[in-house]
Amino acid sequence: KKNIFIIILILFSLLINQYYGNKGIFPVDSFAHFDTGFRILLGEHPFKNYWIVSGPIIDYFQAILFYLFGANWQSYILHASIINAVVSVATFLILIKFNLNIYYSFFYSIIFSVLAYPTSGTPFVDHHSAFFSLLAVYSLILAIKDDKKFHWVLFPLLLSIAFLSKQVPSSYVIISIILILITFSLIKKKYYWIKYSFLSFASFIIIVLIFGNIQGIKLSSFLQQYIFYPQTIGTQRISDFEFTFRGTIGHFKFIYIALIPLFFLNLQKIIFEKGYYKHKDFYYFLVLILFTFSLIFHQIITRNQTFIFFLIPLLFAFS
């Protein structure tokens, strides 16, 4: 039964994104990685042959798909469809892991797949960064739950991929996770995970540096284009931010509504259960709520197309 649901979910997630990817386009954003993915096939590389401020991971993955299936619109959309299928199946599996009824898990995952990548249809940096961050969140939750080395190794890799998709919202998620892990370590007196996560992150950095060196990409070019220049954009957006009830609260009201059961359930436990802050459920709650607010903050600051309504079925499922 589980395998049948997974197969159905994969097919549905792929097909629904292929459908909406062919329904329409955004004049600039929809083509953002078509040209750059094709340029990699021609032997050019980001940071070296063309200026780029986000999305190198997306460009290389798109180049692979173009190589396998040809440089056409359907293989371009397939990129987003694959990510949609991966995060939808991952959502289904983690809900089952937390003993949610398999039918409810399937239902929430189907709704998730409709609200995830189909909002764009085509590969987009914000989506990739958010979804790889979500996969990292899943891995972290499982690391806390099962205490397996694999998950402690995996989540830094996923966060690194998220960051190389786009600096934000991944940076906000990274900061949130660091704060949670500091709290987790001090309260639970567990520090062993540090060596596994650090070695994982260090290995990823070394591989990226070796790859960049082979391709002739200068570290200075990467730092200038991907780290320093985008900070000027972010600083300007933050300085231009103006609080409005509609933009900050009203626009995300359905996400806040989905948060209410999870928030009050855990608030009740914090108040009435002695030592709840030592319980694993408390850290699941922290991870989910800080991930949610990281994405909301990102949407408020960037004021791009709203794409985070996939949080609604996810939050209800964990409530």
Where are the language model's segments positioned?
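Extracytoplasmic catalytic/substrate-binding loops of multi-pass membrane glycan-assembly enzymes
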Residues: 21-36, 46-61, 71-74, 215, ...
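Transmembrane-helix signature of polytopic, membrane-embedded enzymes
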Residues: 91-114
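Membrane-interface transmembrane helices that cradle and orient dolichyl/undecaprenyl
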Residues: 97-99, 136-154, 162, 255, ...
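Perimembrane helix-loop-helix junctions
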Residues: 145, 172-205, 317
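Membrane-lumen/periplasm interface segments of specific transmembrane helices
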Residues: 194-237
